[in-house]
């Protein structure tokens, strides 16, 4: 079916514009409650968590009212990282978990994503059923649900994160600068790392409802890079607004992205954890990452962009590790979804076990220069059948001479086409990416 609301990562958009409005959220809560209660037996509870956007409070109330109207009991978690909602949904044996967040976007956006009772994102068929239910008139259940606050939800998640580490693991003597993006990890991540013994300098931990991701977090790590060098810290760690992404900064202030972090975790597993059966990346994963894994004898496969597709391929192949260069990393041996804090702990475990600085470990793989440019598009476009664009793509590939890649990918969450060019020569890659982006922009205008 053609989807009206759900994208690749739930429902997302500008607050106040359809469907990101209180009246829609009321109806969405009711529709989701009806579908999930009709489909499953057992728990009658659905959990709701959110990041720190000011609009999250009104959407929480609207969803809560809709769910209660459908006869569903609601557990309110308050500010909670997206993976924390997934974890608590499992441990409470809830019917589902709902996250109110627009991830790394500005506060003017918000969105909704659902987790099933097993802590994984809802399959497409259930999202389709919710869309169908949204077309029906809202009817009040004979028995209304109830709502309650879940006590010490943050503390439960903190203990879970620490519990994923082997007995005796500690970070004593390590100075970490933690950038929480004024987001959902602000009161959780610093406690996890400090309780494991690290000296923690937290930054961007003062959310006011409108400053989430503003000049900070995993997509804007420049301030973190400066702070690590200024303080002479060992490492910097940056999360995005909802805590499912992570990137590192080494002691020299150099950024370490998701591909490099995945490589480090895989190298650790291969040598110290009984081997790494394989790693799932995406179409955007750097070719140098693939070559680095090949040197270690670790299989690699590419999924479509989006953590749900990474997780699907991991399940299909029976592999335990996957992720994206943006910092979405999934370690399925310890959790069910992308989790910034858990992934950071896995990297720290690798660093402490290997006994080397991050700056040195990451050099095991040599990234190829990669340039990505976002081109705005007013409406969805058929890139594959646009002759002008395809001629430009072919010409770019010819200029790379078989030593690089070209990828055009419409974003699943924003009205943009991502133009990516990868190759051996940085100057050439930048020039070709700009030329191709100009052609795409002209063709879509």
From Swiss-Prot:
Enumerate the cofactors the protein uses: Mg(2+)
Q: Where is the active site?
A: 103
Cofactor comment: Binds 1 Mg(2+) ion per subunit.
Q: Which GO terms describe its biological process?
A: carbohydrate metabolic process; peptidoglycan biosynthetic process; UDP-N-acetylglucosamine biosynthetic process
- Enumerate the residues binding Mg(2+): 103, 240, 242, 244
Q: Please provide an example of a Pfam family that matches this protein in its UniProt record.
A: PGM_PMM_I
Report the catalytic activity: alpha-D-glucosamine 1-phosphate = D-glucosamine 6-phosphate
* Keywords, comma-separated and alphabetical: Isomerase, Magnesium, Metal-binding, Phosphoprotein
Q: Name one GO molecular function term.
A: phosphomannomutase activity
What cellular component terms from Gene Ontology apply here?
Answer: cytosol
Q: Which residues carry this modification: Phosphoserine?
A: 103
SUPFAM superfamilies (UniProt xref): Phosphoglucomutase, C-terminal domain, Phosphoglucomutase, first 3 domains
Identify the EC number(s).
5.4.2.10
How is the protein altered post-translationally, as described in the entry? Activated by phosphorylation.
The UniProt entry, under InterPro entries, shows: A-D-PHexomutase_a/b/a-I, A-D-PHexomutase_a/b/a-I/II/III, A-D-PHexomutase_a/b/a-II, A-D-PHexomutase_a/b/a-III, A-D-PHexomutase_C, A-D-PHexomutase_C_sf, Alpha-D-phosphohexomutase_SF, GlmM_bact
Has keyword Magnesium?
yes
Q: What does this protein do?
A: Catalyzes the conversion of glucosamine-6-phosphate to glucosamine-1-phosphate.
Question: Which family is this sequence assigned to?
Answer: Belongs to the phosphohexose mutase family.
By its UniProt entry, which PANTHER family does this protein fall under? PHOSPHOGLUCOMUTASE (ALPHA-D-GLUCOSE-1,6-BISPHOSPHATE-DEPENDENT), PHOSPHOHEXOSE MUTASE
Q: Would you tell me the protein name for this molecule?
A: Phosphoglucosamine mutase
């Amino acid at each position: 079916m053609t989807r009206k609301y759900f994208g690749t990562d739930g429902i997302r958009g500008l607050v106040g514009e359809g469907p990101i409005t209180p009246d829609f959220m009321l109806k969405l809560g009711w529709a989701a409650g009806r579908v999930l209660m009709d489909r499953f037996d057992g728990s009658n509870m659905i959990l709701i968590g959110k990041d720190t956007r000011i609009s999250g409070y009104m959407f929480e109330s609207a969803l809560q009212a809709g769910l209660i109207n459908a006869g569903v009991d609601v557990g309110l978690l308050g500010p909670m990282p997206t993976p924390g909602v997934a974890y608590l949904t499992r441990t409470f044996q809830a019917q589902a978990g709902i996250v109110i967040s627009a991830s790394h976007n500005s506060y003017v956006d918000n969105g909704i994503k659902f987790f099933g009772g097993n802590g994984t994102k809802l399959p497409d068929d259930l999202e389709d059923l919710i869309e169908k239910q949204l077309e029906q008139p809202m009817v009040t259940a004979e028995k209304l649900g109830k709502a309650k606050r879940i006590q010490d939800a943050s503390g439960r998640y903190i203990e879970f994160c620490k519990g994923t580490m082997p007995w005796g693991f500690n970070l004593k003597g390590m100075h970490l600068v933690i950038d929480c993006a004024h987001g959902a990890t602000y009161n959780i991540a610093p406690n996890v790392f400090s309780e494991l013994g690290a000296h923690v300098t937290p930054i961007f931990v003062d959310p006011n409802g409108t400053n989430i991701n503003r000049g900070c977090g995993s997509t804007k790590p420049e301030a973190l890079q400066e702070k690590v060098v200024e303080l002479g810290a060992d490492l910097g760690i940056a999360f995005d607004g909802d805590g499912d992404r992570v990137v590192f900064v080494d002691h020299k202030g150099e950024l370490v992205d998701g591909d490099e972090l995945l490589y480090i975790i895989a190298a650790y597993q291969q040598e110290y954890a009984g081997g790494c059966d394989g790693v799932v990346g995406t179409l955007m994963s750097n070719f140098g990452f693939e070559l680095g894994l090949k040197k270690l004898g670790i299989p690699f496969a590419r999924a479509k962009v989006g953590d749900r597709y990474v997780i699907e391929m991991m399940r299909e192949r029976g592999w335990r590790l996957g992720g994206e260069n943006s910092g979405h990393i999934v370690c399925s041996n310890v959790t069910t979804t992308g989790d910034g804090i858990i992934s950071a702990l896995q990297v720290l475990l690798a660093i402490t076990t290997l006994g080397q600085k991050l700056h040195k470990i990451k050099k095991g793989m040599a990234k190829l220069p990669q340039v990505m440019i976002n081109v705005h598009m007013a409406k969805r476009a058929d890139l594959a059948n646009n002759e002008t664009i395809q001629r430009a793509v072919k010409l770019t590939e010819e200029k790379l001479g078989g030593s690089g890649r070209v990828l055009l990918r419409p974003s699943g969450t924003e009205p943009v086409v991502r133009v990516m060019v990868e190759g051996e020569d940085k100057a050439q890659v930048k020039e070709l990416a700009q030329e191709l982006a100009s052609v795409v922009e002209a063709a879509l205008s």
